[in-house]
Amino acid sequence: MKKTLLCWLAALGAAAVIPACGGAAGDKSLSGLDRERFRSEVNGRPTDLYTLTNAAGMEVCITNFGGRIVSVMVPDRTGTLRDVVLGFDNIADYVRIPSDFGASIGRYANRIGHGRFVLDGDTVRLPVNNYGHCLHGGPDGWQYRVYEAHQPDPQSLALTLHSPDGDAGFPGAVTAKVVYRLTEDNAIDITYEATADRPTVVNLTNHSYFNLSGDPTHPILDNLLTIAADGYTPVDSTFLTLGRIDSVGGTPFDFRRPKAIGAEIDSDDEQLRNGHGYDHNWVLATAGDLSRPAARLVSPVSGIALEVFTDEPGIQVYVGNFLDGTVRGKHGIPYAHRTAVCLETQHYPDSPNKPQWPSVV
């Protein structure tokens, strides 16, 4: 079992909480999402939009297509609710436009080098989809699957996916369960479980794109980021980890104290060139410890803060380096360069080929 907590810290208890865009009417969410635009079928399986709410007025919308978080409405310093994640406002765009917006990633999050690894003496070969590597489970990863959904109460949603033996090249049949729970203290509790009928590799994460300003046109370079990590795993020019852990000390990768994401992102640094900015795995000092945050993100514009708690050993930080304005998201807004940051809790990239790192078998 893997657990991640996304804890939102903002000005609660305001006299009024007013949506920043649109409002709930009929089957519309506070973020302006129309549930009917998510009710469809993909590969013969029904899709829908599910809404979680709490007494504090926070709202989270999730679709069972890819197990994706579609919107998160959280109050800013004035008490105004703002949507702080990127995504689409209809199922057709999620199907038509390849993306990881808000997705539950599997069977293996991040990269497996050259699309192959050895398990129990057998070489497993996977389809490659990113610079000759298998990224996020390949071109038919779980972010493009329809999960079975069960909503037992207004604050939780359970999503289940059955992946057969040989699915996308991976050995063993796997049943995965993702449970989203919205707490009364404005935390999204994400729990992952996976069971397999034979040895295989599994690495699950959530791929939400956060923009805590609540304005998806506003770059995230002014966001203050803190990461509880003394080391990170450097990559080559194809984004594949080099198999070692380097110290963050004296480098642009040192976020042990709060620092603006943009403070050093344009530094003359080989790793920043290789990643086109930050797109790296940090080695968490909090591994296995849910009592202290692994990362913290604060928007000076909205005052909204996000704390990430996880029992995973790593976190991939990606700052929207490849967003270029060609994709239009919710409300027709184009998503431009570096207008979001992803905080993907995980095991280290390419772990199946790195026996020195925590096992994913």
Where are these regions (language model features)?
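Bacterial N-terminal signal peptides that target proteins for export
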Residues: 1-9
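Bacterial N-terminal signal peptides
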Residues: 9-19
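An exposed, glycine/acidic-rich loop-and-rim segment of catalytic or binding clefts
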Residues: 21-361
